[in-house]
Amino acid sequence: LLIEQAINHNVRNVVIGNQKLFHSVKEHLAPLGINVMGGNDSITQYISTSTDIDLLLTAMVGFSGLEPTLAGISRGLTVAIANKEPVVAAGEIIMRMAKEHNATILPVDSEHSAIFQALQGEHSPIENIFLTASGGPFLNTPVEELEKVSVAQAINHPRWKMGKKITVDSSTLMNKGFEVIEARWLFDVAPHKIKVLVHPESIIHSMVSFSDGSIIAQMNMPDMRLPIQYALTYPKREFLNIPRVDFYKLGALTFNEPDLSKFPLLRIALEALDKGGNTPCILNAANEVAVEAFLQERIK
């Protein structure tokens, strides 16, 4: 896919993090005059030294995205963050560095993009943030059946097409816990002001309330192309050919409180945020190991 994208978009430089695939990528692209680099260190080095980066979009899986993100921020770049783990593990550092280096942070996660969009043009303090959650594939699964679920079931999300790791996190609601931590740092909001709502339709992606009782919601059909494009074209909006919300067919929107006894990882994530320090970083590391073990069917 990387080779295909590089050719289709006529790029000048390609960095492949997986060293095992470096030679294969180079064999295909070097004859076309494309400079190919290998290894995660090369990604960070390129970001740190390149003079032709207009916008940096970090979409690496897990904690590996932290160093490239910090490299872009230290350059004062506009950084669109698509992977939440760096913000979960080092949100305070990221936002402090962004302020010091006058870097712009654009959230790509659908919920945080929704909050960001709702805040455009607003100068009043936030009263509350409402983070919506679809509830994942096991929303209506009895608790006693959860220990029997398969990998195939856990990565079959009812609303979103995503990578395996984030889909498993969505199944356990750990993803939503991470998003609460992320929102705390991205928008400088006290944890108790961030509420999670289970919203199975996934039409409202987040809401922001203000001191006068107003609530601003961002809505669209569940499609990641919208928040991705918004980050790439910000502050402009460009036409996007995705299905529009049909309120007549939709009929109703539902909201429920998350069941923390059924989905304890959300509770653990909220506790980690309250505890602070390096606790969210430890939680992120433990979760990455556990999810990988689950995907390899070594744990249930």
Where in this protein do the model-derived segments appear?
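Catalytic, metal-anchored helix/loop core of enzyme active sites in primary metabolism
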Residues: 1-300
